[in-house]
């Protein structure tokens, strides 16, 4: 069954609820920097909560922000918007945010992982909301400066004040998202669909599809450079067309030979067996099994990721890719 979603636009949303309120953005990475700058440019009073020893402290000060420790920022804020990595959040929340929360404050997130999987359990006397731009932070900022915005999701997990949705929408407008459109969802749906999309398609699936296509071409005797162009480099051109025009628009833009070959062979390569595998690993997310596995590695996450990344870094496609990027002027 297809569910109808509510979409909110600029002319439907007011930022009045943010007047005289202070938003403390916790973290100054990709999303933290972009959202903090966009909200400030929209007239919101934004402060930052950071680690004094962190590299971002001086950078944020240089960018003109009031910067405090996380504890002090929490005390000063009406909305505490937590934009640090998922596995770091629970410890920071427990030690530096939770002890200083007061009645009527709001906790904000841009991903529902820790709320949905109960790694953070907020007190009942605060609002808990989500404002999740559907683009990397750099793009969130770029599009805002161009006068538009990227689409975003909002959700309410806990509405203590009775104004949680109004607050989430106002924050979405402040980062520019209502210029494009804001979809109302739930913490559960955002978290699970985000993880499933990353694993099956955007990160896991795409890397493996390109890598295996490259390997087949090389194993058949084609030069690695040629294989890279066909399996990887041109993937961006196709994705740009899909992004701008959809599948049908992309197909209209490629040759008839590409159309026929793609439409007849594609479903045989990415067949029902692949879909069954996708469903299997989607269920791991839905059951909480993936979250349990990832959370169990919290203390050694850097080491685990370094080992996994090493396998990719040493693959021939990466060596060839660096050569092609230098040819294209993308790397020095």
From Swiss-Prot:
Judged by the first EC level, this protein's enzyme class is oxidoreductase
Catalytic reaction(s) noted: (2R)-2,3-dihydroxy-3-methylbutanoate + NADP(+) = (2S)-2-acetolactate + NADPH + H(+); (2R,3R)-2,3-dihydroxy-3-methylpentanoate + NADP(+) = (S)-2-ethyl-2-hydroxy-3-oxobutanoate + NADPH + H(+)
Q: Which residues bind substrate?
A: 255
| Record: residues binding Mg(2+) 2 | 194, 230, 234
User: What does the record give as the active site?
Assistant: 111
User: What SUPFAM superfamilies does the entry give?
Assistant: 6-phosphogluconate dehydrogenase C-terminal domain-like, NAD(P)-binding Rossmann-fold domains
Q: Where does NADP(+) bind?
A: 28-31, 51, 56, 86-89, 137
What is the required cofactor set for this protein? Mg(2+)
Q: What Gene3D superfamilies does the record tag this protein with?
A: 6.10.240.10, NAD(P)-binding Rossmann-like Domain
Q: What does this protein do?
A: Involved in the biosynthesis of branched-chain amino acids (BCAA). Catalyzes an alkyl-migration followed by a ketol-acid reduction of (S)-2-acetolactate (S2AL) to yield (R)-2,3-dihydroxy-isovalerate. In the isomerase reaction, S2AL is rearranged via a Mg-dependent methyl migration to produce 3-hydroxy-3-methyl-2-ketobutyrate (HMKB). In the reductase reaction, this 2-ketoacid undergoes a metal-dependent reduction by NADPH to yield (R)-2,3-dihydroxy-isovalerate.
Q: What is this protein called?
A: Ketol-acid reductoisomerase (NADP(+))
* Gene label: ilvC
């Amino acid at each position: 069954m297809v569910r109808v979603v509510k979409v909110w636009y600029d002319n439907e949303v007011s930022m009045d609820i943010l007047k005289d309120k202070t938003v403390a953005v916790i973290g100054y990475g990709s999303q933290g920097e972009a959202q903090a700058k966009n909200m400030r440019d929209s007239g919101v009073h934004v402060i930052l909560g950071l680690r004094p020893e962190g590299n971002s402290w001086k950078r944020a000060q240089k960018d003109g922000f009031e910067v405090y420790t996380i504890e002090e920022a929490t005390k000063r804020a009406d909305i505490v918007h937590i934009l640090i990595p998922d596995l770091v959040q629970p410890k920071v929340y427990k030690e530096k945010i939770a002890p200083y929360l007061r009645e009527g404050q709001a906790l904000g997130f841009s991903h529902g992982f820790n709320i949905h999987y109960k790694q953070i359990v907020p007190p009942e006397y605060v609002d808990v909301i989500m404002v999740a731009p559907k683009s990397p932070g750099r793009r969130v900022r770029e599009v805002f400066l161009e006068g538009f915005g990227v689409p975003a999701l909002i959700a309410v997990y806990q509405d203590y004040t009775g104004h949680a949705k109004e607050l989430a929408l106002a924050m979405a407008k402040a980062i520019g998202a209502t210029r494009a459109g804001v979809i109302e969802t739930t913490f559960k749906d955002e978290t699970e669909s985000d993880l499933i999309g990353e694993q099956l398609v955007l990160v896991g699936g795409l890397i493996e599809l390109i890598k295996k296509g490259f390997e087949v071409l090389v194993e058949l005797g084609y030069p690695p450079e040629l294989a890279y162009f066909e399996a990887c480099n041109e993937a961006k051109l196709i994705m740009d067309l899909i992004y701008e025009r959809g599948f049908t628009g992309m197909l209209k833009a490629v040759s008839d030979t590409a159309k026929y070959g793609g439409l007849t062979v594609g479903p045989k390569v990415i067949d029902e067996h692949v879909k069954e595998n996708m469903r299997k690993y989607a269920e791991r997310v839905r059951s909480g099994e993936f979250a349990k596995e990832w959370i169990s590695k919290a203390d050694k996450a850097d080491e685990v990721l370094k080992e996994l990344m090493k396998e990719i870094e040493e693959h021939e496609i990466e060596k060839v890719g660096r050569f092609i990027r230098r040819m294209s002027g993308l790397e020095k």
